């Protein structure tokens, strides 16, 4: 296939310009501009040709109007909202669900953990599938899976089986796993690296995390207020909202986003090793608090999961031709530090989320709707945090914002660990939630921007997968760890507050370690920038 582009050069310091038509024989190649030449880039492939001109924001051929771009941004924000609402709409009615299925108290953790477990385990491959087969296609697949299994989750009431409900929620999580990473991949393709608009869009997407948490919990609580037996409509309503999002995505997402122009292939061996290892490892940590660590199958599964995960990393580093994890990431210590800090921060928040709702329902005896309504703080301060990120990330840099986010996660967990049961909501509780908003809304855009800008264009879906894998998987895994601590401290089950606080102390420890890592990364980043600045001044 032959492609034509214009090369723009200056002639001997004059303002005159020469337009040269240059024919380039290219197949799945990108013409990259040089230091001295301003080149209009053409991406050519056997399937489609994309032209990227000098627009400071994105390729203007993606959107026919500003209104359509706004709809695209709204679709991206809804994806994040659904991701968080998918967790809290069930969390705030967990006592209703437990009573409906006659579940034991210990099984409540599984009613909540199966969704983020599946989402976190499958997100890792969903971005790569989007990079290979089309980001929009995989996004649509994710929406369809969520719609189908949301309906089945509601119908599970008639099975009278909590195991069936837990399985349905897991498949619902698989669908969610295909939504957000591919949305983030589309943002990475549509908007230019480092552009202000890209930072704005990612910040707005991040703002929908606390907003989604509030709407999910509030509407879940509202539906069961009059009649708890109507809880299936919580999931039917979620399916309807997902269907409307599907229609928006179908219409607003451009069809001309390049697909696999670099000829990537799927690493099925690495994918299988990763998924099996992640699921088994997570299962062990969530099942052990229920049955006890002395059960032989728990120890056996733990050993098997570790073997699979070690095999995955060995295979990816030495044998995979096209590794699932880009080597540009696995060999970059700073990217690993970022992902580890995000893991620890969101892991502590996963513990906070479950035990905060348990605290309100079981100790303060709030109704499900009031428990969900307390998340309104997240909407207000989450929006403030999003605007702060959007307009400060260029000045402060994502490294500093990531550090602030870990401090917010840590402060929120510390405040929860000393929160009195009888104290008014408007004191420590209100302040705690306001601070936690900055943990969520600073960490997501900061880490997403660092990885999106740091990885090649062909890995944009994978960049979205990495951040969201860490966020979702850490929430489920660390909840299991928190459950282990809780049951060790409150073995009799008669001292809920003592057990809850013990789990939250673990969250404090995780977030504190995240602060240490993020501060280390920030200082190294500042030192490298200072050193480069000195090198430039010496060269000048």
From Swiss-Prot:
<feature type="transmembrane region" description="Helical">
    <location>
        <begin position="399"/>
        <end position="419"/>
    </location>
</feature>
<feature type="topological domain" description="Extracellular">
    <location>
        <begin position="356"/>
        <end position="372"/>
    </location>
</feature>
<feature type="topological domain" description="Cytoplasmic">
    <location>
        <begin position="451"/>
        <end position="461"/>
    </location>
</feature>
<feature type="topological domain" description="Extracellular">
    <location>
        <begin position="294"/>
        <end position="295"/>
    </location>
</feature>
<feature type="topological domain" description="Extracellular">
    <location>
        <begin position="420"/>
        <end position="429"/>
    </location>
</feature>
<feature type="topological domain" description="Extracellular">
    <location>
        <begin position="483"/>
        <end position="502"/>
    </location>
</feature>
<dbReference type="InterPro" id="IPR011701">
    <property type="entry name" value="MFS"/>
</dbReference>
<feature type="transmembrane region" description="Helical">
    <location>
        <begin position="233"/>
        <end position="253"/>
    </location>
</feature>
<dbReference type="GO" id="GO:0035445">
    <property type="term" value="P:borate transmembrane transport"/>
</dbReference>
<feature type="topological domain" description="Cytoplasmic">
    <location>
        <begin position="191"/>
        <end position="203"/>
    </location>
</feature>
<dbReference type="GO" id="GO:0080139">
    <property type="term" value="F:borate efflux transmembrane transporter activity"/>
</dbReference>
<feature type="transmembrane region" description="Helical">
    <location>
        <begin position="335"/>
        <end position="355"/>
    </location>
</feature>
<dbReference type="InterPro" id="IPR020846">
    <property type="entry name" value="MFS_dom"/>
</dbReference>
<feature type="transmembrane region" description="Helical">
    <location>
        <begin position="430"/>
        <end position="450"/>
    </location>
</feature>
<keyword id="KW-0472">Membrane</keyword>
<feature type="topological domain" description="Cytoplasmic">
    <location>
        <begin position="394"/>
        <end position="398"/>
    </location>
</feature>
<feature type="topological domain" description="Extracellular">
    <location>
        <begin position="153"/>
        <end position="169"/>
    </location>
</feature>
<feature type="transmembrane region" description="Helical">
    <location>
        <begin position="503"/>
        <end position="523"/>
    </location>
</feature>
<feature type="topological domain" description="Cytoplasmic">
    <location>
        <begin position="130"/>
        <end position="131"/>
    </location>
</feature>
<keyword id="KW-0812">Transmembrane</keyword>
<dbReference type="InterPro" id="IPR036259">
    <property type="entry name" value="MFS_trans_sf"/>
</dbReference>
<feature type="transmembrane region" description="Helical">
    <location>
        <begin position="462"/>
        <end position="482"/>
    </location>
</feature>
<feature type="topological domain" description="Cytoplasmic">
    <location>
        <begin position="1"/>
        <end position="61"/>
    </location>
</feature>
<feature type="transmembrane region" description="Helical">
    <location>
        <begin position="109"/>
        <end position="129"/>
    </location>
</feature>
<comment type="similarity">
    <text>Belongs to the major facilitator superfamily.</text>
</comment>
<feature type="transmembrane region" description="Helical">
    <location>
        <begin position="62"/>
        <end position="82"/>
    </location>
</feature>
<feature type="transmembrane region" description="Helical">
    <location>
        <begin position="170"/>
        <end position="190"/>
    </location>
</feature>
<feature type="transmembrane region" description="Helical">
    <location>
        <begin position="273"/>
        <end position="293"/>
    </location>
</feature>
<dbReference type="Pfam" id="PF07690">
    <property type="entry name" value="MFS_1"/>
</dbReference>
<dbReference type="GO" id="GO:0071944">
    <property type="term" value="C:cell periphery"/>
</dbReference>
<keyword id="KW-0813">Transport</keyword>
<feature type="transmembrane region" description="Helical">
    <location>
        <begin position="132"/>
        <end position="152"/>
    </location>
</feature>
<feature type="topological domain" description="Cytoplasmic">
    <location>
        <begin position="524"/>
        <end position="540"/>
    </location>
</feature>
<protein>
    <recommendedName>
        <fullName>Uncharacterized transporter YMR279C</fullName>
    </recommendedName>
</protein>
<feature type="topological domain" description="Cytoplasmic">
    <location>
        <begin position="317"/>
        <end position="334"/>
    </location>
</feature>
<feature type="topological domain" description="Cytoplasmic">
    <location>
        <begin position="254"/>
        <end position="272"/>
    </location>
</feature>
<feature type="transmembrane region" description="Helical">
    <location>
        <begin position="373"/>
        <end position="393"/>
    </location>
</feature>
<keyword id="KW-1133">Transmembrane helix</keyword>
<feature type="topological domain" description="Extracellular">
    <location>
        <begin position="83"/>
        <end position="108"/>
    </location>
</feature>
<dbReference type="GO" id="GO:0016020">
    <property type="term" value="C:membrane"/>
</dbReference>
<feature type="topological domain" description="Extracellular">
    <location>
        <begin position="225"/>
        <end position="232"/>
    </location>
</feature>
<feature type="transmembrane region" description="Helical">
    <location>
        <begin position="204"/>
        <end position="224"/>
    </location>
</feature>
């Amino acid at each position: 296939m032959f492609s034509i582009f214009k090369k723009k050069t200056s002639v001997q310091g004059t303002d005159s310009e020469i337009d040269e038509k240059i024919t380039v024989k290219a197949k799945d190649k990108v013409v990259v501009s040089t230091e001295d030449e301003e080149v209009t880039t053409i991406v050519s492939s056997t399937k489609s040709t994309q032209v990227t001109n000098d627009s400071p924001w994105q390729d203007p051929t993606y959107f026919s109007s500003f209104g359509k771009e706004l709809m695209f941004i709204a679709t991206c924000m809804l994806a994040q909202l659904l991701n968080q609402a998918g967790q809290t709409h069930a969390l705030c009615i967990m006592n209703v669900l437990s009573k409906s299925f006659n579940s034991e108290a210990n099984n409540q953790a599984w009613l909540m953990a199966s969704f983020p477990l599946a989402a976190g385990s499958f997100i890792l491959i969903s971005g790569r599938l989007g990079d290979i087969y089309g980001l929009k296609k995989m996004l649509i697949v994710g929406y369809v899976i969520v719609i189908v299994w949301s309906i089945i989750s509601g119908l599970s009431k008639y099975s009278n089986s909590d195991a069936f409900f837990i399985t349905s929620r897991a498949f619902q999580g698989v669908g969610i796993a295909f939504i957000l990473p591919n949305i983030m991949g589309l943002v990475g393709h549509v908007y230019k690296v480092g552009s202000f608009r890209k930072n704005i869009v990612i910040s707005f997407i991040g703002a929908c995390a606390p907003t989604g948490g509030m709407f999910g919990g509030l509407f879940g609580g509202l539906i069961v207020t009059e009649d708890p037996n109507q809880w299936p409509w919580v999931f039917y309503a979620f399916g309807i909202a997902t269907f409307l999002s599907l229609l928006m995505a179908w219409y607003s997402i451009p069809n001309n986003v390049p697909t696999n122009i670099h000829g990537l292939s799927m690493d099925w061996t690495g994918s299988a090793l990763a998924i099996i290892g992640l699921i088994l490892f997570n299962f062990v940590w969530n099942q052990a608090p229920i049955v006890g660590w002395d059960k032989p199958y728990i120890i056996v599964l733990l050993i098997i999961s570790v073997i699979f995960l070690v095999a995955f990393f060995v295979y990816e580093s030495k044998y995979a031709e096209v590794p699932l994890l880009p080597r540009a990431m696995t060999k970059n210590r700073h990217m690993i530090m970022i992902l580890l800090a995000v893991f620890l921060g969101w892991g502590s928040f996963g513990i906070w989320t479950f035990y905060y709702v348990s605290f309100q329902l079981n100790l303060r005896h709030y109704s499900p709707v009031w428990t969900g309504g307390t998340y309104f703080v997240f909407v207000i301060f989450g929006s403030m945090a999003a605007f702060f990120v959007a307009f400060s990330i260029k000045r402060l840099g994502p490294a500093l914002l990531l550090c602030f986010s870990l401090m917010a996660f840590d402060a929120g967990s510390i405040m929860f660990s000393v929160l009195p049961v009888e104290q008014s909501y408007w004191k420590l509780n209100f302040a705690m939630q306001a601070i936690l908003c900055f943990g969520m809304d600073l960490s997501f855009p900061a880490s997403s921007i660092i990885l999106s800008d740091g990885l090649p264009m062909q890995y944009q879906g994978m960049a979205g997968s990495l951040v969201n894998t860490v966020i979702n998987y850490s929430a489920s895994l660390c909840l299991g760890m928190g459950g282990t601590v809780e049951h060790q401290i409150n073995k009799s089950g008669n001292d809920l507050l003592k057990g809850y606080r013990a789990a939250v102390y673990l969250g404090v420890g995780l977030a504190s370690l995240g602060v240490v890592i993020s501060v280390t990364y920030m200082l190294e980043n500042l030192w490298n920038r200072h050193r480069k600045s000195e090198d430039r001044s010496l060269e000048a």
